[in-house]
Amino acid sequence: METQRASLSLGRCSLWLLLLGLALPSASAQVLSYREAVLRAADQLNEKSSEANLYRLLELDPPPKQDDENSNIPKPVSFRVKETVCPRTSQQPAEQCDFKENGLLKECVGTVTLDQVRNNFDITCAEPQSVRGLRRLGRKIAHGVKKYGPTVLRIIRIAG
């Protein structure tokens, strides 16, 4: 009788362990990797964008060292995206699009959560300072040439 009771108890325990084991993979499958969370954030940025073309992840900075493995806590991210040849209206995933030659580059910073269900992100993207500075310089030079170019040409003709 005692052996039968122990066997029944062992069977219940095994059943509970089996059920617990089946439940755990589904819970862990809901956690995204750092890269997957950033890719999702980039996809959502494309969906909300009003720009003509899609942007694709170009470079992802490594995740910061954190002891906290809680997938609900926002993780800081930093990455760069580059304009692709695919129009935003296309149904093609950005990851399948080629980068546009001389396409616009954007630096993005913010936070993402690794929880696949919540999937929260707060990302801000902007052109890199050096690109903005060069573009501003180019506009000033073009404006100066347009404004003072004819005068400079007259001076060169007179002097030459």
From Swiss-Prot:
One of its GO terms (cellular component) is extracellular space. It holds the Pfam family Cathelicidins. Residues 1-29 form the signal peptide. Coiled coil: none annotated. Disulfide bonds join 86-97, 108-125. SUPFAM superfamilies: Cystatin/monellin (SSF54403). Thermostable. One of its GO terms (biological process) is defense response to Gram-positive bacterium. Keywords: Antibiotic, Antimicrobial, Disulfide bond, Secreted, Signal. Broad spectrum bactericidal agent. Belongs to the cathelicidin family. This is Cathelin-related peptide SC5. It comes from Ovis aries (Sheep). The lineage of its organism: Eukaryota, Metazoa, Chordata, Craniata, Vertebrata.
